[in-house]
Amino acid sequence: MKKFIIIIAALCCTYNASAWSRHIHAGIAAIAHDNLTEEAKKNITELLDGKSIIYHAQFVYDNADNEAYKHTKVWKNVAFTDKNKILKAKKAAKHENKDVRNAQALEGLISSLNALQSGGLTKEQTRDNMLYVITILSDLHCPTHYVFTDLLEKRKSFYYFNDKKYSYLTYWESNSVRGTFNWKTNEFVHQLSRKTPEQVADITNGSVTSWIIGNAPLYRSVYDLLNTGTRFDGQTLRLWQNKIYPISTEQVAVAGYRIAAILNSLFDSNAPQVKIK
Amino acid sequence: MKRLILTLIAILTIANITECFAWGRDGHATIAYIAERHLTPKAKENIEKCIDGRSIVYYASWLDNHRAEHKSWGKLSHVCHYDIHSFESIGKPHKYMKSTINKLKKYRELTDSARKVTIYHFVHSFGDYHCPGHVALYDRTGEKPKRIHTSSYDFYLNAKKSRWNYHKLWDAGIIQILHPDWGYMDWAHALDSSISQEYIDKVTAGTWEDWLQDVAKTTHTVYNIFNRVPKIKNAEDALDKDLSVVDGQMLNEFGEYASEQLLNAGLRMAKIINEIFGE
């Protein structure tokens, strides 16, 4: 029994280390898959040897220990100044804070998108770059991947529930949806893949870079939702979670639609084109 | 079964499950999803328009999640009371359900927010009232009504590692014991994929009052299973010597009842929504 609990706890820790947890990455990919055009779906399925993008929803994390992909280790976060301006990768790389040093996700995303758009890649390179885009664009709809240089201390925020200490960022990554809904992968689609064409147009309007910059003010405000050290009981935790799940579920949906838009743009010549910058 | 129970205990511990509500999230979502599968296109379109295009499943546990923000809801009775002989309804829950359904019937006259909240109440409470953990039976032949079976009936699962009670078993416990990995789509697929029209007609015949009375009769049968639960022999802890042990076979029987109630509640919920929103 004790062994069982330790194993599960260890698994939870592993998932926590990979930004959105595995079930959310799968949910986002499933929403994206649900919104692919037939042509894009056909081309992508061919690229993945018959599998869907859901299978590879967190490719970057699944291959974190592979030497060939070690350059993706700093493709974790995007850093912003106190004015919500993006901190360039070169500057971020020299920062004393590790989360800021790892804030080269936007550059990674852009380089993969540029490579895919320009063509001339092998099948394997095309597959890898597409799967980078899926993992990273998912993560860039998770507030914990936005490192605000003026709020670095707030990244250490924590709370107590029944006298046990929990990290706020880990809550976002693992429980911001699961704290309210026990959705399985297809259930994410049933619940969240139901935007109107007008809503989808609004979500996917602009360039990939503008999506990321546009997320920053909301994700900055997420830090206002917790006074570090707060002690929750069952009822106050529930009240607090009620403020969080509408944001997290909406971000999951938005990520899914935007991934679909960029994949349609890349793999269906008749689909609307999405600008990178 | 023993391993399954141990696994369940571990899952509940790790998940920090502190809230116990009828059926739990998965049960309520299953009922609402079964209902959704049986809605007419018109009814589905109309009810989803009222809740910002979302599925009714999204709001299946909204009442539990948001109860703390609306203190008055905590006072709503979530237990149906029945006479054990006549199965006549006694108490307030019927009045609450009647008022909720009456409000739904006039949904076009309600404000947007009142319409939404009424739908949230209905989708949740209708499921609650199909949960055997939310039925209390009384013998009224004496001077004072006597509650025959208490929902705080305590027992051990066969591993003797975990003390449970009747209410907790029905509040999510039984569903997670049966299929800890299933989501609401899995449950609906398993229960609702091959039912006959005859079954639907039979279960949805009559009024909602008849249906809840039917739940009360079922609950009586469930209570009777507990009556044949053996008491613990040679209990080490004298304080617990009267507790019973529910074994795997009994859990399977409870599972049958739970599955039947989830399905019936979904089919009946669909009938009411179709009647009101299908026009």
Q: Residues of each region from the PLM?
A:
Chain B
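N-terminal, motif-rich segments that launch catalysis or mediate targeting to/interaction with membranes
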Residues: 21-125, 132, 137-279
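Bacterial Sec-dependent N-terminal signal peptides
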Residues: 1-23
